[in-house]
From Swiss-Prot:
Parts of the chain that traverse the membrane: none
A Pfam entry, by short name: DUF436
Domain of life, source organism: Bacteria
Organism, scientific name: Streptococcus mutans serotype c (strain ATCC 700610 / UA159)
InterPro entries documented for this protein: Antibiotic_NAT-like, DUF436
Lineage: Bacteria, Bacillati, Bacillota, Bacilli, Lactobacillales
Protein family: Belongs to the UPF0340 family.
Name of this protein: UPF0340 protein SMU_87
Length: 187
């Protein structure tokens, strides 16, 4: 696998999603990552640290440059807990849990987050503003309502299916109400 190409494709997909989701500085972007799926295997069966590191480092660098926080979701063995910067956990009063991910409990993305983040911690849950799911890891539980599906520029990253979510405020008030425009509303 060409890791430089993987990094470039990750950057292309991410740049487009950040633009279309309208996520802003100080908000949270969640990443679900199956390096097994990227490598062409079955989720949870062929974790690959090199793939996890390339993808997480690429995304973390891009988001840090824009002041957006990254939350990296773990697998179901950790109840889909997330690695975030301690600064974010403190700022949002998130409950920190005590676990260290490994390749088969948490996965390569979480290991990479622990390597590349300044002061990483695990939290059980978060309410993110947008996210990218690489390999059908089910990030929806961590994205706030109302979730809006976004089609990534690429349908796959190597062997992994890609899906993405943004979020928008709920529309309330019914037929008499007026609404402010937003860039992701579908009507």
């Amino acid at each position: 696998m060409d890791l430089e190409n993987l990094a470039e494709e990750t950057r292309i997909v991410l740049a487009d999603l950040i633009k279309r989701s309208d996520i802003k500085k100080g908000q949270i972007f969640v990443l679900g990552l199956s390096s097994s799926e990227v490598a062409g295997g079955v989720i949870g069966k062929n974790s690959n640290l090199d793939i996890g590191e390339v993808i997480v480092k690429t995304i973390l660098t891009y988001l840090n440059d824009r002041g957006i926080y990254l939350a990296v979701q773990g697998c179901e063995h950790l109840n889909r807990a997330l690695v975030v910067e301690r600064e974010l956990a403190d700022k949002r009063n998130l409950e920190i849990v005590n676990v260290l991910p490994n390749l088969h409990a948490g996965g390569s993305g979480q290991l990479a987050a622990f390597k590349y983040m300044k002061d990483p911690v695990e939290v059980e849950e978060i309410v993110a503003d947008a996210g990218l799911d690489i390999g059908d890891t089910a990030i929806g539980m961590h994205v706030k309502r109302v979730q809006v599906p976004l089609r990534p520029l690429l349908r796959e990253l190597e062997g992994a299916h890609l899906t993405a979510l943004a979020s928008r405020p709920k529309l309330i008030g019914g037929s008499r109400a007026s609404y402010q425009p937003d860039p992701i509303r579908k009507f």
